[in-house]
A protein has these predicted regions:
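Hydrophobic, membrane-embedded alpha-helices of multi-pass small-molecule transporters
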Residues: 15-19, 92-99, 108-178, 208-223, ...
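TM-loop-TM module centered on a large, flexible mid-protein loop between adjacent transmembrane helices
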Residues: 1, 171-221, 228, 273
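Membrane-water interface regions at transmembrane-helix termini and the short interhelical loops
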Residues: 55-78, 144-147, 257-270, 286-296
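Select transmembrane alpha-helical segments in multipass membrane proteins
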Residues: 4-17, 50-54, 113-121, 202-219, ...
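Membrane-interface loop-to-helix entry segments
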Residues: 64-93, 272-283, 302-312
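Hydrophobic transmembrane alpha-helices that form the core helical bundles
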Residues: 6-40, 220-236
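A generic transmembrane alpha-helix motif of multi-pass inner-membrane proteins
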Residues: 96, 298, 304-377
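Hydrophobic, small-residue-rich membrane helices and short re-entrant helix-turn-helix hairpins
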Residues: 66-77, 115-118, 138-167, 185-197, ...
Length: 377
């Protein structure tokens, strides 16, 4: 699209999967699954969250400034241990379900057109935008393994991406089934961390809760260290080293610590407007990259498509802002305008038609430019 846009979008991607949402969420997920079940009903949960997140981010900062064997150890031992424990938990739940999925009454949002709210809920995984941000890391790793041919690199990235996608899809599907079946045992949970804790406690008892807390905390710690490191390195490079890696790492860690103390449910709620803004351009960019060979990656097509996508995504973002913010910014009129003129706006997909129109306009401009020299000759 352009160098300036590339810098802007890269910053937005890394901030979203970094200090704004993903890093704080790692700390709150660890707290929700590991510490909350141990607290009494009258315990000052907010105080315990403050203390836990302070210790959590102290470790994050320490190891982000001293990257070494700890992250390798966590990656090679703790992550596989968590996956093994998760597989045992899911198998136990599937073999003794709390209720049949068909017997569970869906919540209001999923009683009709379940696909659309589920699609938007999928934004919360941040998988697509993380793929854009860290795809270059995968390529660098493959090159360090001695693969220099671009076609071979593309083939390796594709095969590893397909395998990763298939495994992630399997994990998501199994988690959805187990979560639905658990409605026969528990009331609807406020967030997934609470649900996972309840399921682990029911099927595996106190030992299961301890293992879950241990493995998730260390897995989230490794993820946070990796995210702080990646964000700090990226922003240090973008500022040409004028602001050091150390300064960025400290800034991102302190900011993440502050955000984490609003709690997991609040982080999820406040992340929705940002994800509604950033996901449509991310999806459009991915699709354009796949289709680029058909228009020689013409910059005009990219710019036109991105223009249409961003223009509509802003309305989707407005719609999902908290009601007090909408009222303070007097957004009723623009939201009503979008609802009246953008198809699928009520499904949070109002950006689709503008993106298609932008793509068509870009292709038309490209075609007219190619025809003009021929006509003159």
């Amino acid at each position: 699209v352009g160098k300036g846009y590339g810098i802007f979008f890269t910053c937005l991607l890394y901030l979203t999967i970094g200090p704004l949402f993903a890093i704080p969420r790692c700390a709150t997920v660890s707290f929700t699954t590991g510490i909350t079940p141990l607290l009494g009903a009258d315990s000052p949960e907010q105080l315990y969250l403050l203390l836990f997140s302070a210790v959590f981010f102290a470790f994050v900062l320490f190891f982000s400034l001293r990257p070494g064997k700890i992250t390798v150890w966590i990656g090679k031992i703790i992550n596989p241990l968590f996956l093994f424990f998760f597989a045992v938990l899911m198998l136990a739940a599937l073999l003794a379900p709390g209720a049949a999925v068909s017997a569970v009454e869906p919540v209001e949002a999923y009683r009709s057109d379940a696909f659309f709210p589920a699609l938007i809920e999928g934004y919360g995984t941040m998988d697509a935008i993380a793929g854009l941000a860290f795809g270059i890391v995968v390529i660098d790793v493959i090159r360090r393994m001695g693969v220099d041919n671009d076609d071979a690199i593309a083939e390796d990235v594709l095969s590893s991406g397909l395998l990763t996608g298939a495994l992630m899809a399997l994990i998501y599907v199994v988690s959805i089934v187990v979560g639905a079946q658990s409605r026969g045992l528990f009331e609807l949970s406020e967030n997934g961390g609470i649900a996972l804790t309840q399921i682990a406690g029911h099927y595996l008892g106190g030992v299961g809760l301890f293992i879950l807390a241990f493995t998730i905390t260390f897995a989230c710690l490794k993820t946070s260290i990796g995210l702080v490191t990646a964000c700090a390195e990226t922003f240090s490079k973008m500022t040409n080293g004028k602001i050091s890696y150390r300064s960025w790492a400290i800034l991102f860690t302190v900011f993440s610590f502050a955000v984490s103390n609003i709690g997991l449910s609040a982080i999820i709620e406040y992340s929705i407007p940002m994800l509604m803004l950033i996901y449509p351009p991310a999806i459009a960019l991915i699709l354009l990259a796949f289709l680029g060979k058909f228009f020689a990656h013409d910059r005009t097509v990219y710019i036109a498509t991105m223009t249409g996508t961003w223009a509509a995504a802003i309305f989707d973002c407005m719609k999902t802002l908290p009601a007090p913010v909408q009222a303070a910014l007097h957004l009723d009129a623009p939201i009503a305008f979008a609802a009246a003129h953008l198809p699928l706006f009520d499904k949070n997909l109002g950006w689709l038609l503008p993106a298609v129109i932008g793509f068509a306009a870009g292709m038309a401009i490209r075609a007219s430019r190619r025809q003009t020299p021929a006509a003159l000759s």
